[in-house]
């Protein structure tokens, strides 16, 4: 998958320091027979995996620009992450995403400032970081605050 052999992909995706994206969200939607609505905090865009499959439940994720966080709703019957596919839950998840966007709780990978933990070189965005990694062999980066 994605340019890897099956064994390479399994090793990659089961590494606790790695995570998946669209492909894995599609797989999980099908496997668990639930819609997965991923809301991009920066843009407000919602990508819904499993849409049109007639699933009766939905899970909401917030995409920070770096990773996904599950949305858990606190109901009188307890905390729940899996909800009916109704407009009320969608509206609440969108409201949360809008609040986080207003607070700047997302990372813009194109404009974030990074530094190389090996040599200290400062870069703007993930493209410059990949270019630096290719030229120097350095692969340890951190966000500059």
Outline where the language-model segments fall.
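Interface signal in eukaryotic adaptor modules for cytoskeleton, membrane trafficking
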Residues: 1-21, 27
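Short loop-to-beta-strand transition segments
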Residues: 1-3, 34-40, 141-144
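Short amphipathic alpha-helical segments embedded in low-complexity Lys/Glu-rich regions
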Residues: 1-8, 41-48, 131-136
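Residues that form generic nucleotide/phosphate-binding pockets
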Residues: 12, 31, 132
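Deubiquitinase catalytic domains
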Residues: 24-111, 121-128
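C-terminal recognition-helix end and immediately following basic linker
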Residues: 111-112, 125-145
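Short Cys/His-rich metal-coordination motifs, predominantly Zn2+-binding knuckles/fingers
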Residues: 117-119
